[in-house]
Amino acid sequence: MTPDDARAVASYRSRSVSRTWRPEELVLRVVSKAMRVPASTVLSGNRRHDISLARHVWWYVCATTFPGGRAETMRRCRVEKRTLGYALARIEDRRDDPAFDDLLSAIELDMPKDTSDKPGH
């Protein structure tokens, strides 16, 4: 991970936000900042390599962070089962690259421990 990537991920730790974010929105914001792809572009469905990679990382982090795993990710991110399965496999394969694994680990560390949006959790 380059120093710029680390700064991008760490920048969210020092910000305060005035609205309540849904868990998938929070993950999207952190991933889009770390990967330097605007959140609106990640959501656009564009198939360009860097954009689809950011989208797949978003889904991967959601699937590994949310208590409901894949099913919860499919519901929250509005993604089909096969598409999600492909994305998760793609990201797992990319984790063999130390630089990519460092970036993904930094993103995962930046996620709150409790991503439930239910009261009392």
Where in this protein do the model-derived segments appear?
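Helix-turn-helix DNA-binding helix
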Residues: 83-85
